[in-house]
Swiss-Prot record:
Its EC number is 2.1.1.-. NCBIfam families: rsmG_gidB. The gene is rsmG. It is found in: Cytoplasm. Keywords: Cytoplasm, Methyltransferase, rRNA processing, S-adenosyl-L-methionine, Transferase. GO terms for cellular component: cytosol. Specifically methylates the N7 position of a guanine in 16S rRNA. GO terms for molecular function: rRNA (guanine-N7-)-methyltransferase activity. Belongs to the methyltransferase superfamily. RNA methyltransferase RsmG family. This is Ribosomal RNA small subunit methyltransferase G. S-adenosyl-L-methionine binds at G78, F83, A129, E130, R148. It is an enzyme of class 2 (transferase). Residues 218-237 are annotated as: Disordered. Pfam families: GidB.
Length: 237
């Protein structure tokens, strides 16, 4: 996808980009490729592929009407090079975005990126999702949690649901639909007082299938969740 195609597709969906936003995406691409030489951020470095499979793919929650352009608090777990939250932040500057990542090198990249792109209202923390979720400054503080290709729902729910306010939503972006994954996660979702509200399917402009599972938090998460770092993965609920 050429950058111009990216701009045109957004304009067609009533999301025209300003010159500043176009420059932000362009600089994002440049820094991603430059830093990818030093630390492993992505296997995708071809410009047209980055615009399609990282930038366009990341803004799917906005294109699907799931996220409003308001000062809402969004947490991105395991964002890697900033996907999906930072492309959404460029599009919707009102969003207040927090990223937690377990690799300090990636956090360094994200801090530089935010500085270069002049993004305000972005916060980066180095550490494990399981640990921050027990901190009252993070627990039950967010309207949305996003996770793009992070883990199976059975594991992901325990890592993310505790961060949501009651009524808040987890948006899990995936490249493959796995109905059995949601069946496996049924027990975990019940224990975490949360419920699958929707499982959206759509396609990228090149026809690659994509899915977003929307999970709503119905009641406060019991204090014992999430368990200690590593446990959700080792022994899923």
């Amino acid at each position: 996808m050429k950058p111009k195609t990216f701009y045109n597709l957004l304009a067609e969906q009533n999301l025209p980009l300003s010159d500043q936003q176009k420059e932000q995406f362009e600089r994002y691409f440049e820094l991603l490729v430059e830093w990818n030489e030093k630390i492993n951020l992505t296997a995708i470095t071809d410009k047209e592929e980055v615009y399609l499979k990282h930038f366009y793919d990341s803004i799917a929650p906005i294109l699907q009407g799931l996220i409003p352009n308001e000062t809402i608090k969004l947490l991105d777990i395991g964002a890697g090079a900033g996907f999906p939250s930072l492309p959404m932040k460029i599009l919707y500057p009102e969003l207040d975005v927090t990223i937690i990542d377990s690799l300090n090198k990636r956090i360094n990249f994200l801090q530089l990126l935010a500085q270069e792109l002049d993004l305000n209202g972005v916060h980066f923390y180095h550490g494990r999702a399981e640990d921050f979720a027990q901190d009252k400054n993070f627990r039950a503080q967010y309207d949305f949690v996003t996770a793009r290709a992070v883990a199976r729902m059975q594991v992901l729910s325990e890592l993310t649901i505790p961060y949501l306010k009651v009524g808040g939503k987890l948006l899990a972006l995936k490249a493959s639909n796995a109905p059995e994954e949601l069946l496996e996660a049924k027990n975990a979702l019940n224990l975490l007082f949360s419920k699958v509200e929707d499982n959206l399917s759509y396609a990228l402009p090149n026809r690659d299938p994509r899915y977003i599972t929307v999970v709503e938090k119905k009641k406060e998460t019991p204090n014992k969740y999430p368990r200690k770092a590593g446990m959700p993965n080792k022994r899923p609920l």
